């Protein structure tokens, strides 16, 4: 049976039937005995969750086997390792691992927990179904034969069952909703077998117990973990562990007990301090189961971790201590695990994924726990247990493990995600973290970066370095570092729960409790502390120490990137953090919230951030400044910075480009021309607009000089050019008639400026008029008469009244002068451009244009068109002229002969 795996997905009803049959056949024992299930359950869990029907969940509770069976593919891979793990901690851990794995496998992690250990199972069943509990107890007892846990589970199972029963009930309720559990149950035949008896009995209630297990698992699991812890030699008998677990979930006292126990760190988080694994179990049911089952942090753990990263990861178990932290991260059994957390991707999933909600990952959440194990974590926790905050975090998430369970939040993933979910759970966590509901537990931080944070921190922390180191170690982890890492995720989340994240990172390793502490700062600090000092001392001082820790972590963690980012970010948080415990719930969120903005600002304001991040301490002190900036507004801060750098800069460039030119032009005023430092627009205006104005002025000046502005108007000029000679003649005649009137009336006339004030139109008439008017002097004489007569009239009017004697002489002189002026122009009159001449010119021009231009060019048509039009007009004109000439010469009587113009 051990080697046989089911890949078939069964409905709830089918599973119920199967569980009954399995129970009858005693498959439960075989399933429990099999060492592959735990590992495969991990991997299978993920597969089962989505694929398996929720129905199996009940069986899972009773029989983790079904969940296990659903994970056959993974099981084979991990069988050897799992078996080893099982062999190591198989006695009772085996059961726990199976259960735990199934727990991860089955959505209902609680069920996994039930399976986890006889104790856990009884608890689950006890809470959900007494009958199944008995059958399970029997099965567990059988298993107990190999596992020392047996005794503890039985007593513990019952006691735990009673105290945890409520939790189980609650958890089952949560869990039932999640189909993850059922998927797990179909996972493996072994689990089914094992779970069949226990699960079969609790078949109906199985689902509920399973879900109960979510929380219960947390608690039960812790118990299981404790059981395994006992086997591991954590120093807590299964019973004690269970008691601790019960206590943990029940109250902060549990964390204290846990702290006392030493594994307590995790327990505090996980409720079961007994073993980090246990904590993990509590924290991340899966992990715990793994831990329990891998009681041995040995290879099995790694295997488990691999196959059931979620499970084994949480189990972290990998080496109870180190492993745990590492396990949580399990990413790589060893450091990897820590690092893996980073890696987690799969695992991280668990770790981070947990956040990610990789259902399994929950245990990742345990990730916190993961390094719960790390004693350091424990120390941190121990203080934390004391530390109300820690405890609170725990209480707040007393179960948080269970809270994490809270996984319940996500029944399956539940634990995993839930852990992170803690949002739901967070409450507890939130308590600590209220600030950031999620962040609270490191989850938030993690959540923010599902993976990185948690994983990173926890991991980077290097597996174990103890957590502390890991925390730092990592600068990866540096939770803060993580921010560095992925400042984006981290930052954002970090921002939201930067502290948390850092915390998570450090804290994670340090202890779940810290994460759970839910004080983002606390966690951060815890993490820091953990990193800096094994957490014990720092952790206790959640607030102040944390602040310090935070500072140190910042410096230590390598806020380098984070420094700038987190430096500010964190600083803002740090401030809240500095405020200590209080800000846990309140300020962290602000800090985080600001942090995100800050983050952006930080990025943009890398320089400023670099200043602040000088060191943890620096960041701490700076954080106030930074915080104020953030407070004023992260964006605002960046805006201010931009305004300082950009604003001034922009003005400067503008001043250089625009202001200088305008200033010179303005100052130069009239001397603008001399100013060459002008912009193109100005130059354009100067050369074109000003020039036009000047031209107008010049024209006006010329008009004034001519003293005939009215006559100079263009309309008059146009009239002149288009007027016929007859009209011009009539005007001249009118002028003549006016002259006598002036003479007769001797009306004062305007003072004669020039002897011949002729208008431009008149001048044109004179020079361009055709010969038809008569003698060449005709126009000139008219002009002369018109020009001279006003003067005469004036003279007469002004004089005695008698015309001056010199008038005839004056007229003669004027006439001579005009003749002399016109004589040389006589020939010019013949050259005056008449329409005939213009037509000839145009024809010539058209010919030249057509011959010299490229007729194949795109615009050649324009030239040809103009030439043709002009030529045609000229031809028509010439024809007309010819017709007229003929008529005038022949004077034929028939008018029809002359073509009409």
Swiss-Prot record:
Cell compartments where the protein resides: Cytoplasm; Nucleus
List this protein's GO terms for biological process. Answer: regulation of DNA-templated transcription; response to muscle activity
Region entry Disordered, spans? 29-511, 564-671, 731-752
Q: Which GO terms describe its cellular component?
A: cytoplasm; nucleus
For bias type Polar residues, the affected ranges are: 100-112, 267-276, 347-379, 387-418, 426-457, 465-484
Sum up the protein's function in the record's words: Regulates the expression of selective PPARGC1A/B and ESRRA/B/G target genes with roles in glucose and lipid metabolism, energy transfer, contractile function, muscle mitochondrial biogenesis and oxidative capacity. Required for the efficient induction of MT-CO2, MT-CO3, COX4I1, TFB1M, TFB2M, POLRMT and SIRT3 by PPARGC1A. Positively regulates the PPARGC1A/ESRRG-induced expression of CKMT2, TNNI3 and SLC2A4 and negatively regulates the PPARGC1A/ESRRG-induced expression of PDK4.
Q: What is this protein called?
A: PGC-1 and ERR-induced regulator in muscle protein 1
Organism lineage string: Eukaryota, Metazoa, Chordata, Craniata, Vertebrata
Gene assigned in the entry: PERM1
């Amino acid at each position: 049976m051990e080697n046989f795996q089911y890949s078939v997905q069964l409905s709830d009803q089918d599973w119920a039937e199967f569980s009954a049959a399995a129970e009858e056949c005693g498959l439960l024992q075989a399933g429990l005995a099999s060492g592959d299930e735990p590992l495969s359950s991990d991997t299978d869990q993920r597969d089962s969750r989505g694929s398996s029907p929720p129905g199996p969940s009940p069986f899972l509770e009773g029989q983790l086997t079904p969940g296990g069976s659903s994970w056959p593919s993974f099981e084979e891979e991990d069988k050897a390792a799992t078996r080893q793990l099982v062999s190591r901690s198989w006695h009772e851990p085996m059961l726990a691992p199976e259960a735990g794995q199934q727990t991860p496998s089955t959505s209902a992690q609680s069920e996994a927990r039930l399976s986890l250990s006889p104790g856990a199972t009884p608890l689950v069943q006890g809470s959900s179904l007494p009958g199944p509990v008995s059958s399970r107890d029997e099965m567990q007892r059988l298993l107990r034969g190999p596992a020392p846990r047996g005794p503890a589970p039985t007593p513990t199972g019952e006691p735990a069952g009673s105290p945890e029963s409520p939790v189980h009930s609650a958890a089952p309720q949560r869990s039932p909703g999640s189909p993850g559990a059922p998927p797990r149950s179909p996972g493996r035949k072994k689990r089914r077998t094992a779970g069949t008896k226990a699960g079969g009995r609790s078949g109906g209630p199985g689902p509920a117990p399973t879900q109960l297990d979510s929380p219960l698992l947390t608690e039960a699991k812790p118990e299981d973990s404790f059981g395994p812890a006992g086997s591991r030699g954590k120093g807590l008998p299964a019973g004690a562990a269970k008691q601790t677990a019960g206590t943990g979930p029940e109250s902060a006292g549990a964390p204290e007990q846990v702290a006392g126990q030493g594994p307590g760190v995790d327990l505090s988080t996980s409720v079961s301090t007994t073993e980090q694994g246990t904590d993990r179990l509590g924290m991340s049911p899966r992990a715990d189961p793994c831990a329990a089952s891998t009681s041995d942090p040995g290879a099995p753990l790694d295997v488990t971790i691999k196959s059931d990263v979620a499970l084994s990861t949480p189990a972290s178990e990998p080496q109870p201590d180190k492993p745990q932290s590492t396990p949580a991260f399990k990413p790589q059994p060893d450091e990897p695990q820590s690092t893996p957390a980073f890696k987690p991707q799969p695992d991280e999933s668990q770790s981070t994924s947990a956040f990610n909600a990789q259902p399994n990952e929950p245990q990742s959440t345990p990730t916190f726990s993961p390094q719960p194990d790390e004693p350091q974590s424990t120390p941190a926790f121990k203080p934390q247990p004391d530390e109300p905050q820690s405890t609170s975090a725990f209480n707040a998430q007393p179960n948080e493990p269970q809270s994490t369970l809270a996984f319940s939040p996500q029944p399956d993933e539940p634990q995993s995600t839930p852990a992170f979910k803690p949002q739901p759970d967070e409450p507890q966590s939130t308590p600590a973290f209220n600030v950031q509901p999620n962040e609270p537990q490191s989850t938030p931080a993690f959540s923010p970066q599902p993976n990185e944070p948690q994983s990173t921190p926890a991991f980077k922390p290097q597996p174990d370095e103890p957590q502390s180191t890991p925390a730092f170690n990592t600068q990866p982890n540096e939770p803060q570092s993580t921010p560095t890492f992925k400042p984006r995720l981290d930052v954002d989340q970090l921002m939201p729960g930067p502290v948390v994240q850092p915390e998570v990172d450090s804290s994670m390793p340090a202890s779940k409790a810290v994460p759970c502490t839910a004080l983002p700062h606390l966690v951060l600090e815890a993490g820091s502390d953990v990193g800096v000092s094994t957490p014990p001392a720092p952790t206790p001082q959640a607030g102040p120490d944390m602040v310090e820790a935070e500072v140190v972590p910042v410096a230590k963690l390598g806020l380098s990137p984070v420094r700038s980012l987190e430096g500010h970010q964190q600083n803002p948080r740090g401030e809240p953090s500095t405020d200590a415990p209080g800000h846990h719930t309140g300020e962290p969120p602000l800090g985080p919230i600001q942090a995100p903005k800050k983050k952006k600002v930080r990025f943009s304001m890398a320089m400023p951030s670099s200043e602040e991040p000088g060191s943890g301490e620096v960041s701490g002190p700076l954080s106030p400044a930074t915080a104020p900036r953030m407070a004023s507004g992260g964006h605002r801060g960046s805006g201010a910075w931009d305004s300082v750098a950009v604003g001034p800069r922009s003005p400067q460039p503008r001043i250089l480009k625009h202001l200088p030119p305008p200033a010179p032009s303005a100052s130069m005023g009239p001397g603008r021309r001399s100013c060459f430092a002008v912009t193109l627009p100005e130059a354009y205006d100067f050369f074109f607009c000003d020039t036009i104005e000047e031209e107008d002025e010049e024209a006006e000046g010329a008009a004034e000089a001519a003293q005939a502005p009215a006559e100079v108007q263009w309309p008059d000029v146009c009239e002149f050019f288009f007027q016929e000679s007859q009209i011009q003649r009539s005007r001249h005649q009118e002028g003549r008639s006016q002259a006598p009137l002036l003479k007769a009336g001797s009306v004062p006339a305007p003072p004669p400026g020039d002897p011949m004030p002729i208008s431009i139109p008149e001048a044109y008439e004179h020079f361009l008029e055709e010969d038809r008017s008569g003698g060449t002097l005709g126009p000139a004489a008219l002009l002369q008469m018109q020009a001279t007569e006003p003067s005469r009239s004036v003279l007469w009017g002004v004089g005695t009244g008698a015309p001056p004697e010199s008038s005839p002489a004056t007229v003669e002189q004027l006439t001579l002068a005009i003749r002399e002026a016109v004589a040389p122009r006589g020939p010019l009159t013949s050259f005056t451009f008449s329409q005939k001449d213009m037509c000839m010119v145009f024809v010539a021009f058209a010919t030249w244009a057509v011959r010299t231009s490229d007729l194949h060019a795109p615009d050649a048509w324009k030239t040809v068109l103009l030439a043709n039009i002009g030529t045609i007009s000229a031809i028509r004109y010439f024809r007309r002229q010819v017709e007229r000439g003929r008529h005038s010469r022949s004077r034929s009587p028939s008018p029809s002969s002359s073509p009409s113009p």
